[in-house]
Design a protein with these regions (language model features):
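Residues that scaffold the ATP/ADP-binding catalytic core of kinase and kinase-like folds
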Residues: 17, 26, 44
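A short, structured beta-strand/loop element
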Residues: 8-23
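Generic hydrophobic secondary-structure packing signal
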Residues: 12-14, 29, 36
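Short, charged, surface-exposed hinge/linker loops at domain edges
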Residues: 1-6, 10, 35-70
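A short, exposed loop/beta-hairpin motif centered on an aromatic-Gly-Thr core
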Residues: 21-31
Length: 70
């Protein structure tokens, strides 16, 4: 089974929520959030239905890009 997680930065924390699942966690750093995702997924499912993979989807802002006309 594949679990899909949306990961985003809310300005202070990295937040993660399950897509189609009642899973939510967060972390102060990206690495902490990923570890918390693994733990949250593990406790969400019974032992018999543990997922085999976690797909983490994230949008990361690159900052403002300016273009100049030539």
């Amino acid at each position: 089974m594949l679990v899909k997680i949306e990961l985003y930065h809310d300005g202070e924390f990295w937040c993660a929520r399950g897509i189609g699942e009642d899973i939510f966690t967060q972390g102060a750093t990206l690495d902490e959030a990923v570890e918390n995702i693994k733990e949250a997924v593990a406790v969400h499912y019974d032992e018999a239905e543990q997922p085999t993979s976690i797909l983490i989807l994230s949008e990361i802002e690159l900052g403002s890009r300016t273009t100049t006309a030539s």
